[in-house]
Amino acid sequence: PKGIIVGDYYSGQKVFDGGYEAYAEVVVNNGEIVHIELNERPPLTYYASEWAGETKRRSGYGFFQAKSPRTDYTLVTLINGMSYLEWQVLKNQKLDFEYKTLFGSSNSARNGFVPLLKEMSKEVQGKTSNKRYVGITQPYDSGISTRLEVIYENGKIVDLKYDEIFADDKKDIKNKTLQEFYR
């Protein structure tokens, strides 16, 4: 996301397939879904110990998965699959519909994200949340964007997140020592 996003905040979590956790955050402003972000955390027993118990979305997991021989065949990573589901939600402006999934990330979608989003649909469509979301993302010419997210509940800050998001392409990052961190 770029710019400023404001709205009612909804979040959910679902445990699936022996300990994987699917997460969803949805922001609605004046009846319109303006932001959605999915994430996944594998169990502590995950076969690749460096990712066991760690969220995958904005980590090096996408690079790890892209190096897998299986990915050579599918050309899809979990992050691609999450982005595709998010795009469908924003396009359809609802959470409860027939999702399409990408081969190579469909287990997480079918067993985690899609059931979670369908469970959340009644809450998101049914009532105003007592949590508010303010997110600001500012891109810079350096190839790095800063992102600040603040979640309020009853007028008090209950969560605060800050992240620096590196460009998708190494050459867009001006500082050579930071180029290895491209998305």
How would you label these PLM feature ranges?
Residues P1-V6, G12-N130, V134-R183:
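Active-site- and interface-proximal helix/loop "cap" or "latch" segments in soluble metabolic
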